[in-house]
Each structure stands twice: as C-alpha cells, then as structure tokens.
C-alpha cells in the first residue's frame, strides 16, 4: 500500500509542479483526481480491491481503519469527527496494492492536464497520459 503523499509527489514531479509555495494545481484538485482514479481502477480491475488476498471495502486506511475517500474543500478538515491537517491527510494510506500506483499517477496527471486543455500541447499530454493509464490498468 502507499500514501496519498507518494501519489501527489510523483504526479507533481511529472507535471513539473514541485514548488510548494506556488503550486499550479491545488492539493485538493490532485486529491479529487486521485479519488476518481481509484474508482476507475476499481471499476476496470475488480481484483484491485484485494490487498494481500483480503477484500477491502474502502479506499483509504486512516489510523488503521478503512475509510471512504472524502476530499475536503480546505484544511484543516474534519473527517469522521477528527480534524486533520493537510500533512496528516497526505499521510493516509491508499487501500490498494503497490502495483496500481503507477496507473493512479497517470490518471492524476491526465486529469491535471485536462484542466489546461485550452493549450494544445496540454490537451495532447492529457490524452497521452490517459492512454498510459488505460494501458497500465489493462496489462
């Protein structure tokens, strides 16, 4: 399993969006794309719901407990009665085996480039990363 922070970091590196004081994409935008990507992977590959041979019901693990992937509008945020900072949210574990991580990164990048699709180059990049996503999920 891997953390939200790991996916965000890998996506930002490929998006050339690593200057923390001036991110082009807000963390919540990346988290929304991540949640949607997890849903896509689970729909296309139902076996992705299994971790170490056990069926998982929820997309995140928060403090050892499975949880839905709810993206707050801002931080600090209250989830399930507990308030979390942005860094604490980033430390949540994604309830999926590591082999799906690369596919999820591709999906996040695709979604971020879709936001900039008025730029022809970004529209092409969005399509290229969606193709990488679909190929990696289906292989």
Q: What do the predicted segments below correspond to?
A:
Residues 1-139:
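Glycine-enriched, solvent-exposed interface loops adjoining structured elements
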